[in-house]
Regions:
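Start-transfer (signal-anchor) and selected internal transmembrane alpha helices
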Residues: 1-24, 44-116
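Transmembrane-helix motifs of polytopic, lipid-linked glycan transferases
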Residues: 183-207, 246-249
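Membrane-interface transmembrane helices that cradle and orient dolichyl/undecaprenyl
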Residues: 244-263, 301
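Extracytoplasmic loop-helix module adjacent to an early transmembrane segment
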Residues: 35-44, 102-160, 168-173, 417
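Transmembrane alpha-helical segments
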Residues: 223-225, 337-341, 408, 431-434, ...
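Membrane-embedded, lumen/periplasm-facing catalytic core of multi-pass transferases
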Residues: 456-525, 529, 589-598
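Transmembrane-helix signature of polytopic, membrane-embedded enzymes
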Residues: 197-223, 241-242
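Hydrophobic/aromatic-rich transmembrane helices and adjacent perimembrane loops
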Residues: 237, 360-364, 409-443
Length: 598
């Protein structure tokens, strides 16, 4: 696939850089006597300049690498002359797709309407990331936002996902309207579904007896993790799974057809996928490692074993897998220079280290995935089943789930589980095809089996909805949270306007909240906007009269609880001087406005 001399050169450079980074970390930064203290102004400037310079070179090298891989893929594109003459154009396929798949087209349309109706500015981190965009009358969206850069490239807490959220960053330059952003979310989601269905067709071989696209759509669109991720904007798993779907498709084609262009496109998606999630490398390297090990011990037909006298043949046969495994070296070098060194200098603890091995909440899909891995592994080792690319993907999905469990815990309904749910959905659809192909040989009617498969998919969704962590409850919970935030904010605006008309002094107290960056709160009417620090138990005037000074609460002050919830009670905040004057719902701990009466 690639020149072996070039591979050796790149590997040597990578390992050399890694060695230099390790020496720098343990031999220079740990004593760090010649460096300014991190808590000094000079130390902060040094850290910021280092992050800026290192990430600038990283982005330039990544762009060059992606361009090089795209060029190689284009040069090596192998097309069958018969396919070129008979294959429909992309536009023709798009135009005729609703006619060929009317149920899926209707499902996509209805799903998009629900997504757009759900669109809102009120998504946790977005309130801080775009705190000033409303103040500019939605006209200053085309600008670099420090909040996005700081969130990903300047964290200095040993986390590593430099490209996360940058798709949203770039999208916001084109339009500031969240309804348009949600349409892009829908396009990404449906692209994943279509590519996933195409991959399932390739993996199924001749057993394409079920409506694959419809089955895949039902299973993936109505999973709780899908709703959690795509009905919001703030989670990078959207792009990770989009890249993963493309990776699975080209890797399957490469595994079956051995086209060189597919190998380069696999490597391209794997390279980009490394930098959107710190655990994402498992999704792109574990399948390759699985194929490498399985083939080397003779479990894959038409792939050579690892023998001393045929090492060159082995290298040629597993060139893609070796390159994908080599991405670990690329990731390690980038992590050392972009995250480990600055984090070590900053002297902070690893983010969310207290969540390691904290919880493991599987669902039926994950159990089916684990059972498939176990059964097929035994049967492949016994020679009863042929190794498939699906086996590699399943191992990758399970490894990713265990990796999440080790890092931050695993919950199947959480947005972080989306890559696992994609692998699980692919596994279920392919297994259904294989099962129907087997039943068809036993004389069972194919049409009946196809309808039964779709009904079974709907039945699985129904079973999942018997729990509280399903798709519908997840979407409803998000909608209620967003509505409580915006309704409470609007109500506070009305109350403050009326207080102004009455000639009253307006002092608004708020506490720990996603609204702490004040972009939305500063638009309220007030004399003073006051922040109460729950940890220090101090009041500080953030805006208005006496800005920056301490404050002593007095009668008539407003206490605003948009999303603080139970934390006021948990931190022992004395609520006795306050009277509730508005409540979004007595069933929720947030969405409340109080007024001090003492």
């Amino acid at each position: 696939m690639v020149n072996q001399r070039a591979v050796r050169l790149l590997a040597s450079i990578g390992l050399s850089l890694l060695a230099i980074g390790v020496v720098a970390a343990h031999g220079i930064l740990r004593p760090a006597n010649w460096l300014p203290p991190i808590d000094s102004e000079a130390g902060q400037i040094l850290l910021k300049n280092y992050n800026t310079t290192s990430h600038f070179f990283f982005i330039i090298l990544l762009i060059i690498s992606c361009g090089w891989l795209l060029r190689l893929a284009n040069i090596n594109r192998e097309r069958n002359s018969l396919e070129r003459s008979t294959q429909q154009s992309l536009w023709t396929q798009l135009i005729t797709a609703p006619r060929r798949h009317p149920i899926v087209a209707g499902l996509f349309a209805g799903y998009t309407v629900i997504m757009v109706r759900q669109a809102s500015w009120f998504y946790k981190e977005m309130i801080g990331w775009y705190k000033d965009i409303l103040g500019g009358h939605l006209l200053d969206n085309f600008s670099l936002r420090w909040s996005f850069v700081q969130e990903t490239m300047f964290r200095n807490d040993f986390r590593f996902f430099p490209l996360a959220h940058q798709d949203l960053h770039i999208l916001s330059w084109l339009t500031p309207y969240v309804n348009v952003w949600m349409l892009v979310n829908a396009f990404e989601l449906f692209t994943i579904v279509v590519i996933g269905a195409k991959t399932a067709e390739l993996l199924s071989g001749k057993n394409k007896q079920v409506p694959i696209l419809l089955a895949f759509s039902i299973l993936f669109l109505f999973d709780a993790a899908t709703g959690f991720t795509f009905f919001q904007f703030i989670y990078s798993e959207r792009i990770v799974v989009l890249l993963l779907s493309v990776f699975y498709f080209y890797y399957t084609r490469s595994f079956q057809q051995h086209q060189t262009s597919d190998k380069y496109l696999c490597l391209l998606t794997g390279l980009i996928g490394l930098f959107f999630k710190d655990t994402g490398f498992l999704l792109f390297t574990i399948p390759a490692f699985t194929v490498l090990v399985s083939g080397s011990i003779g479990l894959i037909a038409n792939r050579p074993r690892l023998r001393r006298h045929s090492i060159q043949e082995w290298l040629r046969a597993y060139d893609l897998e070796l390159c994908l495994c080599g991405l670990i070296v690329v990731l390690t070098v980038c992590f050392v220079y972009l995250s480990y060194l600055p984090s070590l200098y900053a002297g902070v603890n690893a983010y969310d280290s207290h969540l390691r091995w904290s919880r493991f909440e599987p669902d039926l899909r994950l159990m089916a995935l684990a059972l498939t891995v176990l059964v097929r592994s035994v049967q492949v080792c016994r020679g009863k089943l042929a190794f498939s690319a699906l086996d590699a993907f399943n191992v990758g999905g399970m490894t990713y789930a265990l990796g999440l469990f080790a890092m931050v815990g695993f919950r199947s309904s959480n947005y972080m589980a989306l890559p696992v749910q994609f692998a699980s959905t692919l596994n279920l659809v392919v297994l259904a095809n294989w099962l129907i192909g087997w039943l068809q040989t036993r004389g069972v009617n194919t049409r009946t089996l196809g309808i039964g498969t779709v009904v079974a998919c709907g039945g699985l969704i129904g079973i999942e909805h018997l729990e509280r962590r399903d798709f519908a409850h997840r979407i409803n919970k998000m909608q209620i949270a967003q509505d409580s935030w915006v309704t409470t904010l609007d109500q506070m605006d009305q109350i403050s306007q009326q207080a102004l008309i009455n000639g009253e002094e307006i002092n608004i107290i708020y506490s720990k909240s996603w609204f702490r960056n004040r972009g939305h709160l500063e638009r309220l009417t007030f004399n003073r906007l006051i922040y109460y620090d729950l940890d220090l138990q101090t009041y500080t005037v953030i805006d208005g009269t006496g800005k920056g000074s301490s404050y002593q609460p007095k009668s008539g002050d407003f206490l605003l609880n948009i999303d603080t919830g139970r934390r006021l009670n948990e931190f022992g905040f004395d609520m006795s001087p306050y009277k509730k004057i508005w409540d979004y719902s007595d069933k929720k701990s947030n969405g409340k406005i109080y007024r001090r009466v003492q």
